Amino acid sequence: MKKGSFSLFCGSVLILLLTLFFTACGGGSSSSNPPPPPPPPPPPTTQVNVTVNVLTDRHFISPFVYGVNFPNNPAYVQDTGTTMVRWGGNAATPYNWKNFDTNASADWYFQNRPWDSSASPAWPVDSVQYITAVKNAGGFPIMTVGMLPWVAKDGLFNSVSFSISKYAYTACKINPYYSDDGDGTKAPCGGSTTNYVTSNDPNDAYVPLLDSQNAGDPAGSVYRNQWVTSLAAAFGNSGACPVPYFPNGSCHFYDMDNEIDIWSGTHRDVHQAGSGYNELSNTFVSESRAVKGWDPLAVRFGPVSCCWYYYWNLPSATDNKGTHANVDFLPWWLNDVYWQDQIAGSRSLDALDVHAYTDADPSQLSLANQRALALSITQDWWNPGFHTPAWFGSNSVTSSQALDGNPFRIPRMRAMVNANYPGTPLAMTEWSFAMAGESDFSTALADADAWGILGRERVTYSTRWTAADPANAAYNALKLYTNYDGAHHGFNAISVSATHNADPALFSVYGTTNPAGTSLTLVVVNKDPSNAAQTTLNLGGFTPSQVTTYTLSQSSPNSIVAGTSHTWSSTMTFPSYTATLLVITGTTASAPAAEWDLNPDTIAVPAGGTVTLHPRLVSGSTSLTISTGTFDAGITPTVTSSTVSGSQQGAVQIVAGNVPGFYHFNVQASDNTTQGGWIVVNKPAASLAKTAGDSQTGAHGTVLPVPLTVTLSPGSSGGTAGGGSVFFSTSAGSLSNGTTSGTKVIAVTNGSGVASVTLTLPGTAGPVTVTAEGPYGLGHPLVTFTETAQ
């Protein structure tokens, strides 16, 4: 140490000691406490603009979208305000209504068991009593009626379809609780259908399910007519639906079986051949009409399709797309059922029911990515620009559908059914977004998103698979819409336009108002796991005064936390990973005197085709003048009849361009309301040409000598010439296709695309017009024959 350093060091120590002394005694400071730490930084935020307009896209939300499969007890229905309660699933197909037993089918080794009430022991296992219990809880049951001819003979564990000892095979999988029960597949294993046991006797586990009793029926047979008659009595004689804003005259809801397109997988012990086009149409029509005969108030759902691939294809080796002009299955099925109903003069289909799983596979993803998938994949249901990460995003399985890697599921299904069977609503009786598991909070946020989508996109019936456990946050996601305050107040009845400028994978908003125009409810879902959403809310047509928030968050997943009511502010911050309901009071200065719709708002059209919409009043009484609003390039709408009143519908003609895709348009009304819709432009239509039999003259009451003949040419439609259905109808006389006769008949094209019918002229002289219509799934080409009876 250098000279002088020691004295400097000692001086420094002395100064330090004096400083510590005075600090400890209060010297040198005006306060006894250290200065407070700086406040934590605010959470990261994103800026979002939300625009709500109570005069745009107004429509009543069906109360039946707030449904579930198998809630765990009646209190669940009462607390959540669940409307539709479904008795369904694979086990519903072989359910025996007399002994309350079923077969687990492919879900568990094709083994008999009692109807499973373990998950919901408070419910009756008797299907008839189940209806009564659901109704007493305030819900509306939808019952599944099996269409296969077998039901479980008992609930014994040793009643199995593929006994290893009886059928002497080496099973690929064996029931761990009963060693004689195999899965019906034999070595070499690997999933090939050629390795299935096909010699099994259904009587091992089943008894026949027949429509009605006849002499000589096998012992133990069970009868549908007796069952449905009992169900109808439990539903009640009036059948009326006491639900506001919903015009359906009956609540006797029936699913006509479950996922009938995959019977050869789930129920291959009794249905080994792949389901086929004609089979599924004819079986549905026959059984549906029978149900209507036993219960005149029946509302029948079909075909209860399982999933994307089977919307468009069936597994039959001989009764498939290839033998039906290459028409995609659901368009073909709807078309065929519609034409059969036209011939019969009455409906057999009251709602198109599809299961709406997205087919996205989360199994190989990290937890964070599973959560992100759950919150982005909801776009499968509604976003025209969303390209699915599921397998079919890069594997087209359709023949004629537009942009089939972009599911656009709800508008696509509604467009299809409106084109193929007008006036038929859409049901989605199974769906789930539990990519990270039922208990994960991402599932609750995805559900909050889903319930909003269902109402905005005009689905009529929906039941979640299965009901969320009350211990999980997803339970409260439903209550945001149905019972947010414990007093059974819910989302308002009339959906209105609510849009935003954020990433839809991270943010959603849904809006509704009440008929009086005094309340606006918004559900805001901030799906961003990291960032709060600093949001500017622009309200059009509504003057707000007070707002109360109700929030579901990760920090309080088992309750909906109510905020205090306060004066409206147009700027609000929504924390990350939350779903928030805003209940806003105020006024609508120019509340419309009536509600109207585009009738329909969404429809499918072939490229280059034309469709006419017929705007109508759906409530209230006034007279409106409509005009064309904005529309996407690729379609051209023109108002051809501008008056809409209680006694008159308007008319909007829309001409599609030549590029398949999804095109949006708006129509404005003189009361400042606007309705928007979608045109789904598919591939170009096939052509149908008259090739023989036109312009004939014959004596009245005689058969014209030349059959009325058409030729179907698929062109660029995606179809083929052979196996196409052609619907012939005559203004007088009778048609025959060689098998059936009447004023309306269906003929099928041969391999060259040719179909024909014979015409018997009427008994009186005069002109006769015969119309021939090609498949709706190939653009619905048509031609007209003109004949003369002398």
Question: Where in this protein do the model-derived segments appear?
Answer:
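Carbohydrate-binding surface patches
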Residues: 503-543, 577-585
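N-terminal module-boundary/linker segments of secreted carbohydrate-active enzymes
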Residues: 33-76, 234-235, 244, 281, ...
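The feature marks long extracellular or luminal low-complexity segments
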Residues: 596-598, 612-617, 621, 628-790
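Bacterial Sec-dependent N-terminal signal peptides
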Residues: 18-44, 673, 678, 782
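N-terminal substrate-binding region of glycoside hydrolase catalytic domains
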Residues: 51-226, 255, 260-276
